[in-house]
């Protein structure tokens, strides 16, 4: 592996700005890493080498005249739900192939910032799953990278790119980030990052978000992605703050909520141990810990499915009726199930969601950040569909993996996955959820913990082996 690809986004940006390396050299290093690892992890639907090389050459000319910022000349991967003009959007499914006529705002913002789009990454079909079966985990190719943004997390963890885009409807940025040891931010507050130009799973719950290797890099990418888009009816017309400003202020003065209920129920002992150790370390750093009861927690999963199932089925209604054989069985079953949800049940789920959001907002009057496990269990082996607990209880992986992450989607709060340890059979990551429109505090909290640890610096041993 090239030492260049091991750098963070912030580090390679400084080298590009100082013209110590060229955008073409950075791209070549990333493409070499892709060729070295792709047979192992299968992260990409397509690698846009010719386009990327042309963009890198143009970028080098631009940098000589005007540096556009930390993404200028940096290779980025895009989840194959995002449109790119002239490139098919397949959503990793034979049922869906669209050629976009123009770049949506979120891709255009990356390009305007000088980013070089290297390729499009695999997703679980239509983002409707949590394992991304076509991709593998760079830390153990025998295990799932998680989903649905599994290709994006895998290629970032494998040091093929410095950043990638994802989407998150029930955990699809944070689940693969947890399994691959990357930093993943579920779209900040709903509407903070524009959503037009992406294949939808559930309009009410979909959140875009960045995947990187450090909190600082996440802040840099968010700065570019955030902003108002008139093409997106959910987009927030609110000023975008400077996410880098005050990022290194530490945890002193921040109130960290530690949940007494739900988030530590039925959790792998090693997961709980790692997250509790992270909480203890935060206390040593000066954080104020506040025990909280998460309100209406038992409604998180029913509300998520009560909204997601019918919305996904509505989006796919025509394609499912015309070509059901083109869908994989697991996705087709969920889409057929969504047709059985009544309008009454759907509206009730939306009503309960509103009540939950109000109750959680009251909880956040006492705290600034909530810390809890991202996942209750480690990454499963490829092909596994259930997890068996020590008492013999069997839990479907799709339920286990979204049990905690769905909280962020139902409430609409910004939520960050942050690496917090390893174990003999998988990764352990903690998540932090912040208040609406307060991504800055969430990132500040994450960076303080990251600086006190080295989990984010550990690259996969297998990468580059052949």
Curated annotation (Swiss-Prot):
Record flagged with keyword Cell cycle: no
Region (Disordered): 128-152
Residue runs in coiled coils: none
EC code(s) of this entry: 3.5.1.4
Molecular functions per Gene Ontology: amidase activity
Assigned keywords, A-Z: Hydrolase
Top EC class of this enzyme: hydrolase
PROSITE patterns: AMIDASES
Catalytic activity of the protein: a monocarboxylic acid amide + H2O = a monocarboxylate + NH4(+)
Pfam families according to UniProt: Amidase (PF01425)
Superkingdom in the source lineage: Bacteria
Catalytic residues of the enzyme: 79 (charge relay system), 148 (charge relay system), 172 (acyl-ester intermediate)
Family: Belongs to the amidase family.
Protein name: Amidase
Species this chain originates from: Pseudomonas putida
